[in-house]
């Protein structure tokens, strides 16, 4: 997929409205909501801590005010949706105590990304969101939002109202009949928004492809293929416009890096309405599994007019965003080590590794590994050189003007060379 032909993947995946007009309509609604807000209402402690950090540092305060005043690159806004950093703080504060609502044309599943969209794609914003102190403060904001989304209060959006997830339109869009739920319960039996968002498939919905054939590797996520890259380098300029993969940064310097140099990376993006749990692409033993802290709203500023599109930065974000990394030693010696990287983007950066899935744990092909909370984003699978004989047709990235078609989780991703076919 070339940079010149890419569309906004995040819009294609349903995290943001399909067009700019839809996003601006949603933003107008948020501004109308805060216009009715009690002026004496105090900010959430996490948002107040973010404010205090910026107010207490002259450089951060300068960047914060400049990124609101500057015009974003790659966006054609019809109007400003924020006039000051103080107003931006109030918009953030509203997000922390609300769950995403359903909409056929204005749905924003990543609301913090929506309200920060203007500021992220400005020169001052590039510097602001890469500052480690800002990142730490935003982690506190995201933790507060995650706490709300894991509470019973977040069930207010699981209703039959037009903007509710139990509405007929939402049920069809989600394909709810294929997921475990209690149709007779007012909230389908879910305890919170996060519980709903990390819902399980019914038994039999996603069988493991060629379960007894160790050469068949399966998809770790329900995700639309984005890119296949071969002969990847140990270190490369991942921030450049072409966004090459840099194995050392992608795996955060793990000792397994050498096994993947000159190998292959397959990347895919998750849809907002689909399944957000992860599964093992192979049977084997987990060598290491960890969550690598990273940035939350950083964008690659080498992309010119594409700079404001977060998922046009997918390759870049794979190296710098919060991500869960698994290194698995496959039972099939022809495969060897496989690395799977589950990457959070923007406000969907919560990566949860399954209980007991640390070093030494055994996993079967297709077994669950963990999940994204309050969203998900993209996944990379790394193979050593000469391991993959072919990718399945469904795993090959589509033309950007085609309707996104996800590769089912646990479906055939690739076929490894048989042992006797290994080069060397």
Regions found by a protein language model. Give the residues of each.
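Contiguous, well-folded functional domains in the mature portion of proteins
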Residues: 1-424
């Amino acid at each position: 997929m070339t940079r010149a032909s890419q569309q906004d993947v995040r819009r294609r995946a349903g995290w943001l409205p399909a067009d700019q007009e839809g996003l601006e309509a949603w933003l107008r609604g948020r501004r109308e909501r805060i216009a009715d807000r009690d002026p004496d209402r105090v900010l959430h402690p996490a948002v107040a801590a973010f404010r205090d950090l910026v107010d207490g540092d002259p450089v951060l305060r300068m960047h914060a005010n400049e990124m609101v005043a500057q015009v974003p690159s790659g966006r054609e806004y019809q109007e400003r949706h924020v006039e000051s950093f103080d107003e931006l703080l109030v918009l953030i504060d509203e997000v922390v105590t609300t769950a995403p609502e359903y909409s056929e044309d204005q749905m924003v599943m990543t609301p913090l990304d929506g309200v920060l969209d203007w500021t992220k794609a400005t020169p001052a914003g590039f510097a602001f969101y890469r500052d480690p102190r800002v990142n730490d403060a935003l982690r506190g904001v995201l933790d507060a939002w995650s706490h709300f989304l894991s509470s019973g209060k977040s069930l207010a959006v699981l209703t039959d109202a037009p903007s509710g997830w139990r509405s007929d339109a939402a049920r069809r869009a989600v394909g709810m009949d294929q997921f475990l739920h209690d149709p007779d319960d007012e909230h389908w039996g879910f305890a919170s928004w996060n519980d709903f968002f990390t819902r399980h498939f019914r038994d039999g919905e996603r069988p493991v492809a060629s379960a007894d054939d160790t050469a068949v590797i399966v998809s770790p996520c329900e995700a639309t293929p984005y890119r296949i890259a071969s002969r990847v380098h140990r270190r490369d300029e991942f921030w450049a416009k072409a966004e090459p993969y840099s194995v050392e940064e992608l795996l955060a310097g793990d000792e397994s890096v050498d096994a993947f140099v000159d190998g292959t990376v397959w990347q895919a993006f998750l849809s907002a309405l689909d399944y957000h749990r992860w599964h093992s692409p192979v049977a084997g033993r987990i060598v290491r599994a960890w969550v690598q802290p990273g940035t939350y709203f950083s964008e690659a500023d080498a992309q010119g007019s594409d700079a404001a599109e977060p998922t046009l930065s997918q390759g870049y974000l794979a190296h710098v965003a919060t991500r869960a990394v698994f290194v698995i030693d496959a039972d099939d010696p022809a495969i060897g080590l496989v690395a799977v990287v589950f990457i959070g983007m923007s406000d969907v950066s919560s990566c949860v590794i399954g209980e007991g899935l640390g070093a030494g744990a055994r996993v079967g092909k297709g077994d669950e590994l963990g999940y994204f909370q309050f969203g998900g984003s993209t996944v990379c699978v790394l193979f050593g050189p000469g391991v993959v004989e072919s990718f399945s047709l469904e795993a090959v990235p589509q033309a950007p003007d085609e309707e996104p078609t996800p590769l089912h989780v646990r479906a055939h991703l690739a076929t490894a060379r048989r042992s006797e076919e290994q080069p060397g």
